[in-house]
Amino acid sequence: MVMEKLRKIHDLKKVHTTLEILQFARRGVIPSEAKRFRATWVVLDRNLKSEGKLCLQELNSNIVVVHRSNPKILRLNLKRRDLPYDEEESIDSSSVLLNGLSLSVMPKGFDQLYWESSTSSSEASSPDSRLVTAPKFELSVLEELLKNETRRKGPSPSEVLNSTTSSPASHKPQVLNDFLRMKESREYTEETDTQRNVSRPVDRVSSVRKQIHLRKQSSPQPPPLCSICQHKTPVFGKPPRKFTFAELQLATGGFSDVNFLAEGGYGSVYRGRLPDGQAVAVKQHKLASTQGDKEFCAEVEVLSCAQQRNLVMLIGYCAEDKKRLLVYEFVCNGSLDSHLYGRRSKTVGDFGLARWQPNGELGVETRVIGAFGYLAPEYTQTGQITEKADVYSFGIVLLELVSGRKAVDLSRNKGEMCLSEWARPFLREQKYEKLIDQRLRGRFCVNEVENMLLAATLCIDPDPLIRPRMSQVLRLLEGDSLSDTSLSSSSSGLLNGSPVSILLIGDLSQDSSSSRSSSASSVLKSFSRTQHSSRSSSNAGSPLNPAATQALAFKKYNKNTTRHTQD
């Protein structure tokens, strides 16, 4: 179907398209077919990487390997295209990469290509093994290269490169050396500084956003799961694999005590290793006898939808006889719990199994069982769960990081077992020093603690309408303002009692109506009066805290906005 659509599109441009399907193709058939078709471009799928080496050896055409919509150019040969395909080139193609290109031929965006060297010594000696990777390289760039090549005045590319034929084969062409020298001096200064052990000051402002920006510019290949084992994360988009009980029994050593990890609300968790070497966590379901196959498989389907780089991913399952097991990827570096509360605590987070509705749709009535300390109040009361429930859970995690306490700790005294209930009075009474983990001994960044406590204050609000969105929480953690309208008399401070910083938290940019503007003005007036009354009160021994002021502004602003919307 795709090739048929391409044929119809190119017919308008007088481009003849021929499609041929070869069955039981042997190794090396691609170079021979390319010679038969006299192809100038050979585009290979990622599953045909092995054929790429043969094409480099036997062909002189342009060769590209496409992996996840990102092409890797093995050879870009724009030289002497008018010659017959089987005619020998005057320059040995094995000693020149990008043969036929000079600096004047390369378009403006071409210098964004990344040069990668092969890790193996055998391939490193062959220049053809070096790949030019273009993360978002489009055919328009290649077309521009072709046009510039035909229109370019001056010596031909072959004349430019002929001066390099007398040099030893081990040396790169002069054009390539000049190109690399320009890139090294212009774009790779950071790498040079790193090699010289030059330390640079760390800018903590918007550090999270910078990391996301760097992640987008990095290689499309998923990063290692952790810095210890360097295991890659499972490929996203794959359906969960169905294991047999014998396979999981073999992987866990017969569910031996040596591989025991934790005892959860739904069953025991064991560490295992699959035949391909991947470490997994296998969870046995205690309530397996009460579930049918269809119900269990429906729950597995729901869990498999949770595929994100920072989430533990479901790899597979087992539904054999009355046995029900789930197979997750194993995080050998441990979870947040293990680093905060000790290595012996459970290392696999489990929020229970969600269930489909009878009509097969997933809605707010879906039950998510477990992890009581992280569940939002509206869920525990009504059973309804929305995206603001995730915001509440994230606020609890922030409090865990600041206080070093568990979300629920039954070993503590009454009133201190639930982290949110224990922290709210300190947040309300501005006793923030009571919230900070004493084990830190003052070794923390005050601004970061400010941002975390402010975000946690808003996230754990009992009213879900008042809680910010996760995008707003991200900006809070970075120390940014959350709206275009922000009034601050001085820098805010949670711990040093600095003057109040007034900040409207809301997305004013999305709605410029007069009703929202008037509600914003009313918020400013209302919490200016609140600030004055709080400071003049006889019971107030310190100025109104910025976190409380900002939280109050957010609450009033949201309520006023909701009221205007309903009107």
From Swiss-Prot:
<dbReference type="GO" id="GO:0004672">
    <property type="term" value="F:protein kinase activity"/>
</dbReference>
<dbReference type="GO" id="GO:0005524">
    <property type="term" value="F:ATP binding"/>
</dbReference>
<feature type="compositionally biased region" description="Low complexity">
    <location>
        <begin position="511"/>
        <end position="538"/>
    </location>
</feature>
<keyword id="KW-0067">ATP-binding</keyword>
<feature type="compositionally biased region" description="Polar residues">
    <location>
        <begin position="159"/>
        <end position="169"/>
    </location>
</feature>
<protein>
    <recommendedName>
        <fullName>Inactive protein kinase SELMODRAFT_444075</fullName>
    </recommendedName>
</protein>
<keyword id="KW-0547">Nucleotide-binding</keyword>
<feature type="binding site">
    <location>
        <begin position="261"/>
        <end position="269"/>
    </location>
    <ligand>
        <name>ATP</name>
    </ligand>
</feature>
<feature type="compositionally biased region" description="Basic residues">
    <location>
        <begin position="556"/>
        <end position="567"/>
    </location>
</feature>
<feature type="binding site">
    <location>
        <position position="283"/>
    </location>
    <ligand>
        <name>ATP</name>
    </ligand>
</feature>
<dbReference type="InterPro" id="IPR001245">
    <property type="entry name" value="Ser-Thr/Tyr_kinase_cat_dom"/>
</dbReference>
<feature type="region of interest" description="Disordered">
    <location>
        <begin position="148"/>
        <end position="206"/>
    </location>
</feature>
<feature type="compositionally biased region" description="Basic and acidic residues">
    <location>
        <begin position="180"/>
        <end position="189"/>
    </location>
</feature>
<feature type="compositionally biased region" description="Low complexity">
    <location>
        <begin position="196"/>
        <end position="206"/>
    </location>
</feature>
<dbReference type="InterPro" id="IPR000719">
    <property type="entry name" value="Prot_kinase_dom"/>
</dbReference>
<feature type="region of interest" description="Disordered">
    <location>
        <begin position="511"/>
        <end position="567"/>
    </location>
</feature>
<dbReference type="Pfam" id="PF07714">
    <property type="entry name" value="PK_Tyr_Ser-Thr"/>
</dbReference>
<dbReference type="InterPro" id="IPR011009">
    <property type="entry name" value="Kinase-like_dom_sf"/>
</dbReference>
<feature type="domain" description="Protein kinase">
    <location>
        <begin position="255"/>
        <end position="487"/>
    </location>
</feature>
